[in-house]
Amino acid sequence: MRSPEKDESTVEGEYRVIESELPRREPSRGNNRRNASLAGIGALLLFLFTKGKAILFTLLSLLKYSKFLTSGLSMFVMIWTYSWHYGWSYALGIVLMIAIHETGHLVFAKAIGMPVSMPLFIPFVGALISMKQAPKDAWQEAVVALGGPLFGLVAGLAALFWGLANGSQLVMAVAYFSFFITLFNMIPVSPLDGGRIVTALSPLIWAVGLVLMAVGAWYTFSPILIIVLLLGIYRAKQTWNDRYDPERALYYQVKPWQRLTVGVSYGLIAGISAWGVYLFVG
């Protein structure tokens, strides 16, 4: 027989084993999470009250200069894209010439009080600026359009003389690019600069530009030439349809000295640019 003491010990031992196998209740974490959330919200509010004004001012400043950032970024993308085809040096040179061209538009637009956007650079297309308000007459349209080719021509001449003085084939190639782009832009068809310039002379001159563009598109099948041709036809059609509109008639009324200024400027820029191209291909 077992003694009572041993039985009690066995029973007590079994009880202790069973008790140890019961699941223990974990302490609640709800309060801890709630306290942590409240502390985080409080810290965020304190940060916003103390540093929020500075952050807001910084964001507004960046927004103010976002147009410069966008223009600069598109310019970098254009250089990077061209570098894959032409190398970094030539890519920098031709994009610089395009930037100078667009700067001419900006300067002339600011000179007559016309608000315009910063240039947006598009690889294998060029660059463009948008007018935030339409020109009030053909004179204003012509002035803004003249700025780009004029600046581009001056930049091309500077590159030409620099290349000749230093014997740099790279700079000479950049000069040729500037002359060629300037001459191409002087074709009298909208939306090219030449088409906008001759609005101060006579929209009938667009017919010459349309013929030249049609011939070029036919022989090259260039998508850019085709697009320019279609846009030129569209504007010519609009102008023809509005020929009896009194307001549109006023738009094309310019003073004699303005017409003379535009005509002489157009002839000089186109002629010198053609001479520059002839130096390389003639």
Predicted regions located by residue number:
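Hydrophobic transmembrane alpha-helices and their immediate loop junctions
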Residues: 1-282
